[in-house]
Amino acid sequence: ADGGAGWANPDNLELDDKGNLWMVTDIASEVLNQPVIDRDKVSNSSLRGIYSNNSAWFIPTSGPYSGQSFPFAIGPAETELCGLQFSKDQRTLFLTPQHPGIFNGRRKDMAFEERKFALKTTDGKEFFQVRKVPIGSNWPSKEPNQPPRSSIVGVRRKNNKPIV
């Protein structure tokens, strides 16, 4: 998106009780975190490699920010976030990080690779970012060498008020 604030591959959608739209992305794990050294020499599809992980977004449908996208959550490595669902009292948003490690399996000995990305700031200036990209996943334990597992996560406010 212009200005560098965007997403690709929208997937599951949910509406909260105020009518706001919630959305998760589903970019294949083998496409994520693929080096982009020169943005002008790759296809638009290959630019999806600049995305690090799948994510959840909040999109207000009324008010001064109507139609703008706001990042809400970033999924663990090599997962897709899905199953967006609010509790009846709107105090919990459930997400399911699904099939962690689908591309590289279990992360062994905290393995990672350094990769370079040609990015742009929100005002269009180019810069390079170097990432340490995990190879595989240990979600949800986050303990070295543990097998990855799908899970359900509930997100709540510390003050126990509705999410929105």
Map each language-model feature to its residues.
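Sequence/structural signature of beta-propeller domains
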Residues: 1-164
